[in-house]
């Protein structure tokens, strides 16, 4: 697997998504949570989830080739 392969990108996106999950959870528990920051992070997480879904579908299509 090279540094620019779709599989590598998938791993990177999953890692970034997991990091965002942890950050969002930690910030949400804070008593003085910055709501604007939380919304931005959640929006970024959703965008990552969409990218992950598209890439997973491209790498593993349901229909046989």
Tell where the protein language model's regions lie, with residue ranges.
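Extended, charge-rich alpha-helical interface modules
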Residues: 1-65
């Amino acid at each position: 697997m090279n540094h620019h392969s779709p599989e590598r990108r998938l791993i990177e996106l999953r890692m970034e998504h997991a990091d965002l999950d942890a950050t969002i959870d930690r910030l949400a528990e804070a008593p003085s949570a910055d709501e604007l920051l939380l919304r931005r992070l959640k929006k970024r997480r959703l965008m990552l989830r969409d990218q992950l879904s598209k890439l997973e579908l491209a790498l593993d299509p349901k229909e046989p080739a």
